[in-house]
């Protein structure tokens, strides 16, 4: 069996070169506030991979995605080990676009903090009188730049996203920026409507896109996972305060409340976090992992 080494390690994912494709492995690492924590969260990588597959399958009518297979028999022998079972995806190679495409359907998190101070989120004027966790009249698109590990992503305006893309793709900045915005909002609307029918509010999420060898836009990375999104239970939803969630909010809240934490979570917070990931997956897909 040929040993394979990742060509790229992100906060949570490892990418392996497989010739004309890539193998993307979602590890059980967890990151908060752009820092990789010292804990491993068992089954988290499997939730991320299988949930991405679920959404990729659902949205092919809007935009193609980079997934080739999550079936272990389709990928090299090296990945046919227990630690890769369920958390590995064979993907098409893409030229990734240097923008994180964030869409917000509800006002929460950094968006709420910004709105309280300025009445705006990422430069977008919002109606007066919104309460924390309110649904926005329409989803808003708030792009950011992609940071290297250890740096923070930087929110930018739509106009700045055009200029940023133009640096990498001369003559295509405006066209690509518009496609990123329009696809982001279309994907969010379809998936948020479906999730609500299953009892989950998708408050906000982040997509990443790339270009295939023919220059066509394709969804890359992960899609609508608890790592890239805020999922709230629809039951008991009440604006005016923060909402319980099916993501790593338990971890974020504990870290904020315990600033001298050395980036290590207590085991009960780890257990609650994976419990929420699994519950969200089961509600959305109707399947157990």
Regions found by a protein language model. Name each.
Residues 1-148, 261-289:
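Active-site loop/lid in soluble adenylation, ligation, and acyl-transfer enzymes
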Residues 171-203:
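A long amphipathic alpha-helix within ATP-dependent nucleotide-binding catalytic cores
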Residues 33, 112-113, 214, 228-230:
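Intrinsically disordered, low-complexity acidic/polar segments
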Residues 103, 202-223:
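Conserved metal-phosphate-binding beta-hairpin within the catalytic cores
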Residues 21, 96-98, 198-202, 214-217:
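Coil-to-beta-strand transition motifs
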Residues 117-120, 126-175, 219, 223-284:
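Anionic ligand-binding catalytic core segments
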């Amino acid at each position: 069996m040929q040993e394979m080494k990742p060509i790229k390690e992100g906060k949570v994912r490892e990418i392996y070169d497989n010739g004309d494709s890539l193998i993307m492995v979602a590890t059980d690492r967890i990151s908060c506030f752009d820092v990789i924590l010292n804990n491993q969260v068992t089954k988290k990588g499997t939730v991320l991979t299988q949930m991405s597959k679920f959404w990729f399958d659902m949205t092919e009518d809007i935009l193609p995605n980079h997934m080739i297979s999550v079936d272990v028999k389709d990928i090299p022998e090296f990945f046919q080990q227990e630690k890769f079972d369920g958390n590995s995806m064979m993907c098409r190679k893409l030229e990734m676009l240097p923008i994180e495409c964030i869409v917000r359907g509800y006002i929460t998190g950094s968006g709420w903090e910004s709105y309280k101070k300025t009445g705006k989120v990422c430069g977008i004027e919002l109606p007066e009188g919104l309460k924390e966790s309110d649904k926005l009249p329409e989803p808003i698109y708030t792009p950011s730049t992609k940071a290297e590990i250890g740096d923070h992503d930087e929110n930018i305006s739509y106009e700045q996203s055009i200029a940023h893309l133009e640096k990498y793709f001369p003559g295509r900045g405006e066209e690509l920026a518009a496609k990123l915005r329009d696809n982001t909002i279309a994907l969010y609307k379809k998936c948020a409507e479906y999730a609500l029918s299953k009892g989950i509010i998708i408050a906000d999420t982040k997509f990443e896109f790339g270009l295939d060898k023919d220059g066509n836009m394709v969804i890359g990375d992960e899609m609508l996972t608890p790592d890239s999104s805020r999922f709230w239970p629809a039951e008991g939803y009440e604006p005016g305060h923060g909402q319980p969630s099916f993501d790593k909010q338990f971890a974020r809240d504990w870290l904020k409340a315990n600033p001298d934490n050395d980036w290590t979570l207590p085991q009960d917070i780890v257990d609650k976090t994976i419990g929420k990931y699994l519950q969200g997956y089961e509600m959305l897909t109707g399947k157990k992992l």
